[in-house]
């Protein structure tokens, strides 16, 4: 009897583990296989070969034929006497200076009130001069309503991020603008910090030292986060996240 109970308990535990794995996804299985190990660095790969990659398509001006001066020592876009050292073609590297200091303070207040009263009277209701239970057929309907609304809201946010990251030119648009993407991973003990920068850069905004400020990147996508033990502790459990979405209260 004890063996049957033990086997039944083991089957129940296995079923619960399977249900938990299905509820939390395949990521839980991967995390279980990495218990006691540091987060692994992702392999360096070509961003254009990733699943879901789509080349950037933007409105372009009409192409203009290039003009050449045969007796000139300079060429268009040159910033040095011999050669322009800035990134200008696919595969080149430039440094993105990420300097974000955002501060927002928003306050809203709304007040509404409305009062409504309606009286309806009938002098003759199908020849009936007096309705049973009333003094007459006059005031048949009287309605009144009062509504009021008072709402207040405020948002206070302050963010700061200062760092540098090298980005690679992944695409050259027909008008000369560059599509750049950079990723940086820093592992400290059992926590991995990730920084991703992507966007469209105008070659004229690249400084002589081959750097560009993040504020001059169009369609900028900047993400800074992490993964590891500290991030796992800060995130609520999968079951709690599901209950937060489903419970209406």
UniProtKB/Swiss-Prot annotation:
Membrane topology is: Lipid-anchor
Q: Does the keyword Lipoprotein apply?
A: yes
Q: Annotated Gene Ontology MF terms?
A: cytoskeletal motor activity
Where does it localize?
Cell outer membrane; Bacterial flagellum basal body
Might you report a single GO cellular component term? cell outer membrane
Q: Which cysteines are joined by disulfide bonds?
A: none
Q: Which family does it belong to?
A: Belongs to the FlgH family.
Q: What is the name of this protein?
A: Flagellar L-ring protein
* Natural source organism: Afipia carboxidovorans (strain ATCC 49405 / DSM 1227 / KCTC 32145 / OM5) (Oligotropha carboxidovorans)
């Amino acid at each position: 009897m004890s063996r049957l109970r033990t086997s039944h308990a083991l089957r129940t535990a296995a079923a619960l583990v399977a249900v938990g794995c299905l509820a939390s996804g395949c990521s839980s299985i991967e995390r279980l296989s990495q218990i006691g190990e540091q987060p692994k660095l992702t392999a360096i790969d070509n961003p254009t070969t990733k699943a879901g990659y789509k080349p950037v398509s933007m409105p372009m001006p009409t192409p203009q034929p290039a003009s050449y001066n045969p007796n000139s020592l300079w060429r268009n876009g040159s910033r040095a006497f011999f050669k322009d050292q800035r990134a200008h073609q696919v595969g080149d590297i430039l440094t993105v200076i990420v300097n974000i200091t955002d501060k927002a303070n928003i306050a809203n207040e709304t007040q509404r009130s409305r009062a409504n009263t309606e009286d309806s009277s009938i002098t003759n209701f199908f020849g009936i001069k007096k309705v049973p239970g009333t003094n007459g057929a006059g005031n048949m309907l009287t309605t009144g309503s009062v509504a009021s609304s008072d709402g207040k809201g405020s948002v206070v946010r302050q963010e700061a991020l200062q760092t540098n990251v090298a980005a690679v030119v992944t695409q050259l648009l027909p008008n000369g603008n560059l599509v750049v993407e950079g990723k940086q991973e820093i592992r400290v003990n059992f926590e991995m910090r990730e920084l991703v920068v992507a966007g469209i850069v105008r070659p004229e905004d690249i400084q002589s030292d081959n750097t560009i400020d993040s504020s001059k990147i169009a369609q900028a996508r900047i993400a800074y986060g992490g993964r590891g033990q500290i991030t796992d502790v800060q995130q609520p459990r999968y079951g709690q996240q599901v209950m937060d979405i489903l419970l209406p209260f």
